[in-house]
């Protein structure tokens, strides 16, 4: 199910199980995982978007292997908070994922995360080619970190 309220999402999570975060793009999908205590987010992987079936199968394998209990998906909205074409694409992907997995899904505003991730990697002198391969996973970890920080802030 797709949950719009963070407190409700948190109530549906299984204790001592990690979360997965997804930065969904048309060419690449960034993936991040939390630890079991939901205290830190780590970039995990970047999946090439061959087609939705391959992407969902790859995500399902990660979810099963790491016993993930919930999914955070970055929701791309424009700077004024409006819906874009990519917003609708991500919403459709979230619906497909919901049907395939049955885990709670929370959509998190992802404004500027990919740009921030790219700047972060650039600050370490990482070359453009390597940044472009890793920025989506780092962006996914930033999206997940926003959620984890909100959980801590609200003492959930």
UniProtKB/Swiss-Prot annotation:
- What species does this protein belong to? Rickettsia prowazekii (strain Madrid E)
What family does the entry list? Belongs to the YqgF nuclease family.
Q: Which UniProt keywords apply?
A: Cytoplasm, Hydrolase, Nuclease, Ribosome biogenesis
Its chief place of residence is: cytoplasm
Does Nuclease appear among the keywords?
Answer: yes
The role this protein plays is: Could be a nuclease involved in processing of the 5'-end of pre-16S rRNA.
EC nos: 3.1.-.-
Tell me the enzyme class. hydrolase
> Where found?
Cytoplasm
Q: Which InterPro entries match?
A: RNaseH-like_sf (IPR012337), YqgF (IPR005227), YqgF/RNaseH-like_dom (IPR006641), YqgF/RNaseH-like_dom_sf (IPR037027)
Tell me where the signal peptide lies: none
Query: Which Pfam families does this one have?
Result: RuvX
GO cellular component labels: cytosol
A GO molecular function annotation here is: nuclease activity
Q: What is this protein called?
A: Putative pre-16S rRNA nuclease
Q: Which GO terms describe its biological process?
A: rRNA 5'-end processing
